[in-house]
Amino acid sequence: MNLKRFRKQITAAALAAALCASLCACANTPATQTGTTAAQETTAAQTVSPSSEHRKVIIDTDTGADDASALILAAKQKNVEILGVTVLVGNVDLERSTKNALAALELAGCDAPVYKGSADTLDGTIKNAFSVFGTDGMGDAGLVDPKKQAAEGDAVDFIIDTVKNNPNEVELIVLGPATNIAKAIQKAPEEMKKVKRIWSMGTAGLGPGNASPVAEFNVYADAAAYKIMLDSGLPITVIGLDMCDGAAQWTDAQIEQLEALNGTGSFVAKSFGKIREFYKANGSETVMNCDSLAMMCALYPGFVKSTVNTHASCLTEEGEAYSQVIFYKEGFTYDVVKNDFAYNTVLVTEVNKDAYFNTYLEAIK
């Protein structure tokens, strides 16, 4: 069987196994008997402040539990205007992704419209993580029963029209595969040049992957789309998987704190039920929530401690390195390769992990 056919036939179970290898490796921070790391115990009171400027955003998401928690974080910001949420296949199929986004926004008291986007990837392959997030993407906890329906119209057209009507004002916060964004760039390249910035939760950063040893799931799900986005010339900030390890992971005690809040906190805690089971079954007592961390990078300037300009290239050829994103760091001298690229991304290299959970907790109360 050739590699392309093999990738197209990959099962959810196989993907879950691939996810596990990296996720659990990232979660191997030594913990106390209560499951809380020493660093988390000593920095429990740390928080950072959200942006004080008015922000116009479109959130593009493949809504699973982690995406929903990020939507809630954004919806609770006083200075953030969510112009719309565009959804696509990724963690779950398009219909589930749509319902999950509607449910999260409804609970958070946000009436931003939700637009359906891509039900497929650019190359026709579909990979999802049902075995990680549950069949409904929200922990199979009976949380998804939205009263509203998706807005009329296509997500890609909504992105293009909104950017056109708000030139140099709209930030795209991309929490899943880049399919909707790539289609918008292909369809209206001139209009999309008016995007203020793209914030992407994607790539392995400078660390290991979770879909494969070198690839992160959001890129792996549609590498061709991610390459189009990277090559577009639009201003992009990337938050990689490597930012989500150690103290940035959530413990059982922290999730219990969320559940005690009732309302949005309880919703988030319950939606993480299946992924907590998945992590525990594979030897980890903490869980990643990369999407909320990426949202915090976008909306809380003080949360990001350091960045580096890079040239990022995405490998789209079939093989072991499929969907790996390679970063050439500005100012770094390589022994052989000449580092004279046009730098197309800002890569986040350090965040205030110790403030992550408490900032999230304060925001959604």
What function would you assign to each model-found segment?
Residues 2-14:
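Bacterial N-terminal signal peptides that target proteins for export
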Residues 21-25:
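C-terminal motif of bacterial Sec signal peptides marking the signal peptidase cleavage site
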Residues 29-54:
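N-terminal, intrinsically disordered, polar/charged segments of Gram-positive cell-envelope systems
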Residues 50-55, 73-82, 220, 224, ...:
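Conformational coupling and interaction surfaces
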Residues 50-61, 65-103, 136, 142-245:
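Active-site histidine-anchored catalytic micro-motif
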Residues 104, 108-115:
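A glycine-rich helix N-cap at a beta->alpha junction
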Residues 114, 229, 295:
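A residue-level signal for conserved active-site and pocket-lining positions in enzyme catalytic cores
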Residues 115-146:
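Surface-exposed loop and adjacent secondary-structure segments within mature catalytic domains
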